[in-house]
């Protein structure tokens, strides 16, 4: 005897569907031809439904009532007089309500063959437009298109608050050839929470956050969130045009590194983060006044653990919830641009954490990471390393970089931990790593990815800056890719940072024996396009603040810090300084609390802040400090060998017609009067800056703002002058009026 079930279903398909074991759901559910093309059949699975009617969307008329096949929620029915498929909705009667549901199983695939090809090849730049949760319209019906890459899963479902997290309700369409699963869901609203429910080959079920989610819940929750339809309206056309026309390697670039969660806080106990509107009103004016050209944001992709500072992101495409939504972030970037401030994003592409809702063994296999821990696990952080050899993983990362630059108008990316990407034996002992195909230690796949990444981004986004945190002597980090370089625009100068901070911590009495720590960097300054960085890493984990590193009493500490900044701003290369360092934060950085802004009630801290501000403004005003940063003609030592006095003198040159600037830095507390220095031009000179000025908290030793050149050759120059060099001070001297012929 034929039952209702086997009248509409075949070969136990109904049982498999109920148990969540039927994967080819589009061949079963939805509207299909029946009776050799003489009728249509509609099948659906709606738990707890009492009755289901089929309603034509075109005219709103009821077409048929479906039979209830069983009590679990299977419904089916034949539409005898209809032979051509049409758009319909299901009018569902539940015990407490009636709902109209547009059946998702009536729609064809929305994937584009070109997108699929580029994604698998590893060259997709817009994968986020078809993967993840995207608002789409098809056949006049609006909904959310869900798509995820999980080639080794037996079944993937979308679960969320729109289906009571029922894994059997919305099983996705499988594309066997490329491992993609998709489902177009009408009746989903903005802000809906969702995840992907995956059945592994071993039968285990796991729910995962969407790797391409553009919004996520705050920890400890980890659902992905359907994004809003409304988008920010940009007003930064002037900035974007200026950016595209700027050669940043010849322009002033002074970046202020910011951790948004601890720059400043609000609330009675400082327990609340500033939101993006607060940051627009407070951070941007501060950065502008201080003279920084850029803000560099520490990572803002969603991360569950505050203590990771964002360097262990789980939602690489989702701006963290901590400071607002994506449109709020866009408004913040827009406001930066309208204020003439560039904004760089710290981007983590070297590794990802093992949080179970994240990428780790995403479909039951090592999908994003390497199977072998000798290549797939990072020993320092117990995280996982991306498999850069896999096309889909390269597309995931390349598209993410493009996403931040295209959708959020960021002006560049600073790549974290590049050294760990370049070397297979990074932080590993012999036997703990696998050599490349040629027996070497270089990670050839990662190198290739970085080259492609930089090449693509510089082509697609004119004027962006790609910056590498790279701590080894790997050759060609900032060389073009057609010269076998990695193609970055800038590289952090970790050697200069380590040497100079080591020198800073030495007693002035013994600095004469370590003079080379401030001069050696000029031996290799032009091998790469360096950025001098004093980042968050130097003021945390017991290292203490910059002030804490410096020996002596308070007066000596502040004077030394000002002189150090003078040396840094005079040294060739772009600049980066971590927040709080600009006013002499005393405690090392704590990500759980605001900077110690109360210190600005005290004059020494005001003085350091004012000095840094004046350095920045001079840096922007004088081309000599930037236009030839990466040309040997832009720098000349006057005296790099005066280790006895620990005095450093050098000249910075611009192009023809630009005023040269002379720097004199004294790193001992000894006052020097009648100290002769060579000068590049004849005539009167102006003391542009003196870190020992009273306005900066100094002892007011100097040259009363004026220096007069004499026709007495000195230090390779035809002109020279006798000056007063203040203790632990920095002087910046330049022509007072006009320019004569340089020597």
UniProtKB/Swiss-Prot annotation:
What are the record keywords, sorted? Carbohydrate metabolism, Glycogen biosynthesis, Glycogen metabolism, Glycosyltransferase, Transferase
Q: Which organism is it from?
A: Shewanella baltica (strain OS185)
How does the record describe its quaternary structure?
Answer: Monomer.
Q: Which PANTHER family match?
A: 1,4-ALPHA-GLUCAN-BRANCHING ENZYME (PTHR43651:SF3)
Q: In which pathway does it act?
A: Glycan biosynthesis; glycogen biosynthesis
Summary of the function given for this chain in its UniProt record: Catalyzes the formation of the alpha-1,6-glucosidic linkages in glycogen by scission of a 1,4-alpha-linked oligosaccharide from growing alpha-1,4-glucan chains and the subsequent attachment of the oligosaccharide to the alpha-1,6 position.
GO biological process terms on file: glycogen biosynthetic process
The superkingdom listed in its UniProt entry is Bacteria
One cellular component term from this protein's GO annotations in UniProt: cytosol
Transport is among the record's keywords: no
Q: Which InterPro entries match?
A: A-amylase/branching_C, Branching_enzy, GlgB, GlgB_N, GlgB_N_E_set_prok, Glyco_hydro_13_cat_dom, Glyco_hydro_13_N, Glyco_hydro_b
NCBIfam families for the chain: branching_enzym, PRK05402.1, PRK12313.1
Q: What EC number(s) does the entry state?
A: 2.4.1.18
Q: Which residues does the entry assign to the active site, renumbered to this chain?
A: 416 (nucleophile), 469 (proton donor)
Any single GO molecular-function term of the entry would be: 1,4-alpha-glucan branching enzyme activity
Instruction: List the catalytic activities from the record.
Output: Transfers a segment of a (1->4)-alpha-D-glucan chain to a primary hydroxy group in a similar glucan chain
Instruction: Please tell me whether the keyword Glycosyltransferase is annotated for this protein.
Output: yes
Name of the protein in question? 1,4-alpha-glucan branching enzyme GlgB
Similarity remark: Belongs to the glycosyl hydrolase 13 family. GlgB subfamily.
